[in-house]
Amino acid sequence: MSRRHAAEKREVLPDAKYGDLVLTKFMNNLMIDGKKSVAETIVYNALTRVETKIKRAPIEVFHEALDNIQPSVEVRSRRVGGATYQVPVEVRPERRQALAIRWLIKAARSRNENTMEERLAGELLDAVQSRGTAVKKREDTHKMADANKAFSHYRW
């Protein structure tokens, strides 16, 4: 990490179909080897599947799923006098979103369905109903923070 100054935030353009910035960030995270058109196809088809399953606006479902995955606290390691403590820290909004996106993609990739579209649609539907691997990851993170609440005075 550079000590001189923080890296500039890059401008992300909204996606073509829904005009949503968060969806673009999601696609960029899903993209492999710079193949954005493939990532777009996967996301749009997954959202169409979600729409046919639960008859709601797909972009609303996507945002609700992300909200259900976003962690409010996490633990960070802090070394104090030879011992390493897991200190609970509140998560900044940008990091919340980034973690939720990352967890959702990882959970979708680890599912058993045949295509990535099916996996992503399934994980989105699970996340909306507050179940699934990505939501479990958030719950585990919150449990870790709760268990280490005693060390919260070591914040920095």
Swiss-Prot record:
It holds the Pfam family Ribosomal_S7. PROSITE patterns: RIBOSOMAL_S7. GO terms for cellular component: small ribosomal subunit. GO terms for molecular function: rRNA binding; structural constituent of ribosome; tRNA binding. InterPro entries: Ribosomal_uS7, Ribosomal_uS7_bac/org-type, Ribosomal_uS7_CS, Ribosomal_uS7_dom, Ribosomal_uS7_dom_sf. It comes from the Bacteria. Keywords: Ribonucleoprotein, Ribosomal protein, RNA-binding, rRNA-binding, tRNA-binding. One of the primary rRNA binding proteins, it binds directly to 16S rRNA where it nucleates assembly of the head domain of the 30S subunit. Is located at the subunit interface close to the decoding center, probably blocks exit of the E-site tRNA. PANTHER family: RIBOSOMAL PROTEIN S7 (PTHR11205). Part of the 30S ribosomal subunit. Contacts proteins S9 and S11. Belongs to the universal ribosomal protein uS7 family. This is Small ribosomal subunit protein uS7. It comes from Roseobacter denitrificans (strain ATCC 33942 / OCh 114). The gene is rpsG.
